């Protein structure tokens, strides 16, 4: 007999794990609309209070992947997602979005999965729209965007229709639940490589192990000690790295790469217009904290994608792409191609 919803709640109350097959059953009920809003709220809050285990998160992510609308890609060589869980409260500009243009111009292929703002003043979808890109492409056109530009953006609501059953509950609860950490684990293009920023240090070890269970190829999970869900310039960054099935955990410092430490307040923005200005500052090679943090994150992404042999090698490639104008040109190309595909 499959686990009942009440049994699952009792497990949470007793701080006992819900096993893999049981989580698959429960989350399939959520995604197919068979669980009531009251039970969705109770289960997700119960898991939060108990603290979700690696196995529980992996099973829930597996179900979200099952129910997602996929981007049809046959070749995933050097394909990478650059994504954050959000919720770090740092209100910085869209560092991962800017990094995506740099990484793509240096040889990575990007399948970025994102939505509107969670914690920042503007989410990746908000800022890409303000840059002029079309974020609402159909899955086959996202694949075409990757083929033409090396970048595809997958607007999360377009790929996770089954989440409509949980969305009102999440909104009304207004607190973090397991869903906040599932989004970055459910790339609809099946990107085997990922650079993921997380909002809490405990999630570094958890998410890298979840990605291991989900079969990721090269994953780098980061949390900056100044509470940033990026590779930070303002403090040390905790890293969980999965490569060839093995996990390493370590710290990196800006000084390791000859970079000056700069407080994250220098990267704060109030809205997507300010975020856009910082992105241009970085991509136009203006000597600034914005350029340096984008280069460092893009360099880490190039390493995760298998285009660079190390973060330091990736940083050198990222700097060269910015200095040559290739990164800014990639942004312009992406905007033009997504607009054209949207009219096709």
Swiss-Prot record:
Which is one Gene Ontology cellular component term of this protein? Answer: cytosol
- Positions binding anthranilate 1 in this chain are 84
Q: Name one GO molecular function term.
A: magnesium ion binding
Pathway(s) the chain acts in: Amino-acid biosynthesis; L-tryptophan biosynthesis; L-tryptophan from chorismate: step 2/5
Which residues bind anthranilate 2 per the record? 170
Does the record bear Glycosyltransferase in its keywords? Answer: yes
Q: At which positions is 5-phospho-alpha-D-ribose 1-diphosphate bound?
A: 84, 87-88, 92, 94-97, 112-120, 124
Which domain of life does the protein's organism represent? Answer: Bacteria
| InterPro entries with a match to the protein in the record | Anthranilate_Pribosyl_Tfrase, Glycosyl_Trfase_fam3, Glycosyl_Trfase_fam3_N_dom, Glycosyl_Trfase_fam3_N_dom_sf, Nuc_phospho_transferase
Q: What's a Pfam family this protein contains? A: Glycos_trans_3N
How far does the signal peptide extend, from start to end residue?
none
Carries keyword NAD?
Answer: no
The enzyme's E.C. designation = 2.4.2.18
Cofactor: binding details: Binds 2 magnesium ions per monomer.
Q: Which GO terms describe its biological process?
A: L-tryptophan biosynthetic process
Report which reactions are catalysed by this protein.
N-(5-phospho-beta-D-ribosyl)anthranilate + diphosphate = 5-phospho-alpha-D-ribose 1-diphosphate + anthranilate
- Role of this protein: Catalyzes the transfer of the phosphoribosyl group of 5-phosphorylribose-1-pyrophosphate (PRPP) to anthranilate to yield N-(5'-phosphoribosyl)-anthranilate (PRA).
User: Subunit details for this protein?
Assistant: Homodimer.
Record's protein name: Anthranilate phosphoribosyltransferase
Question: Which species is the source of this protein?
Answer: Janthinobacterium sp. (strain Marseille)
> What is this organism's lineage?
Bacteria, Pseudomonadati, Pseudomonadota, Betaproteobacteria, Burkholderiales
- The gene for this chain is trpD
């Amino acid at each position: 007999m499959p686990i009942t919803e009440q049994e699952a709640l009792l497990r949470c109350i007793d701080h006992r794990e819900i096993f893999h097959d049981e989580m698959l059953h429960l989350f399939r009920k959520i995604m197919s609309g068979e669980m009531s809003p009251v039970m969705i709220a109770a289960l997700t809050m119960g898991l939060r209070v108990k603290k979700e285990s690696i196995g529980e998160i992996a099973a829930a992510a597996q179900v979200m992947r099952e129910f997602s609308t996929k981007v049809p890609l046959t070749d995933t060589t050097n394909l990478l997602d650059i994504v954050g869980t959000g919720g770090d409260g740092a209100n910085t500009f869209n560092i991962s979005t800017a990094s995506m243009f740099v990484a793509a111009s240096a040889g990575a292929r990007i399948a970025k999965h994102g939505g509107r703002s969670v914690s920042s003043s503007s989410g990746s979808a908000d800022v890409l729209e303000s840059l002029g890109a079309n974020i609402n492409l159909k899955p086959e056109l996202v694949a075409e965007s990757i083929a033409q530009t090396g970048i595809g953006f997958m607007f999360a609501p377009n790929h996770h229709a089954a989440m409509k059953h949980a969305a009102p509950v999440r909104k009304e609860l207004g607190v973090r639940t397991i869903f906040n950490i599932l989004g970055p684990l459910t790339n609809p293009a099946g990107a085997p490589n990922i650079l993921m920023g997380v909002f809490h240090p405990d999630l570094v070890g958890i998410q890298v192990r979840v990605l291991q269970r989900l079969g990721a190829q090269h994953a780098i999970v980061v949390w900056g000690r100044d509470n940033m869900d990026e590779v930070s310039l303002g403090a040390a960054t905790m890293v969980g790295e999965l490569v060839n099935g093995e996990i390493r955990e370590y710290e990196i410092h800006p000084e390791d790469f000859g970079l000056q430490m700069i407080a994250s307040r220098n990267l704060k923005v109030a809205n997507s217009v300010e975020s856009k200005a910082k992105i241009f500052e970085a991509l136009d090679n203006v000597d600034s904290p914005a350029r340096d943090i984008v280069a460092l994150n893009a360099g880490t992404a190039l390493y995760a994608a298998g285009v660079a042999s190390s973060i330091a090698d990736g940083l050198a490639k990222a700097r060269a792409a910015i200095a040559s104008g290739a990164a800014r040109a990639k942004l312009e190309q992406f905007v033009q191609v997504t607009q054209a595909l949207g009219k096709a």
